[in-house]
Amino acid sequence: MVRPALILVDQRMSMFYGTRLNMKSVTAAEIAALAAWRILGAGDRVGGLVLSDAGFEAVPARRSRAAVLRLLERVAQANAALSAEAPAAPDAAFRLDAALARASGIVTHDWLVLVVSDFDGAGETTLRHLSGISRRNDVIMALVHDPSAHEIPETGRIVVGDGVLQVELDLADSRVRRNLAATGGDRLRRLIAWQAPLDAAILPVSAGEPTVPQLLRLFGAPPRRRSA
């Protein structure tokens, strides 16, 4: 059955972070590109919402290369606008909910909705929007995370903040390490708890590893053999 797809790609400042290989924003862009071309190759229509701290931009679903290129161009523009010197958006954490509300007004029934995000700021409102979407559509949540969320070094100091308020944390303090690890783990646990009521798939993708092999593993594809 041919059906349309909507890809929501998160390019907020929370995605502008990476300790190994990629920024989360880059991994999200790669996931979106791979998904868009695969969906188009199956003969389906592809559209999207590109989310940034400034808001979001919609790309209507079309069955054409031009539509995919337009979506990926918007993603590239949002990615290029990310900067450590960019001013903080106080309501950035709520932008995901606003984009999901817009998605609810776009999809009707029998759509595939792929949300590619670190789910920063996700809460009960997020779940409510996803529940409404999932009633008549298929939802996939691609959780993009950085290895540092689970691999906290035992020494050193890091500065964390939102661009306005900053604080230095001592990693030698076991309480600090536990809290940092819990932050990354809590998002995954929250999505797992949502999986059953949403009847949705969860794809945890690390920005610290190449994207394609991870997606192949998650979808159960056998590894390609090298030619002799």
Protein language model annotation of sequence segments:
Residues M1-E30, W37-A228:
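Exposed, interaction-prone extracellular/peripheral surfaces
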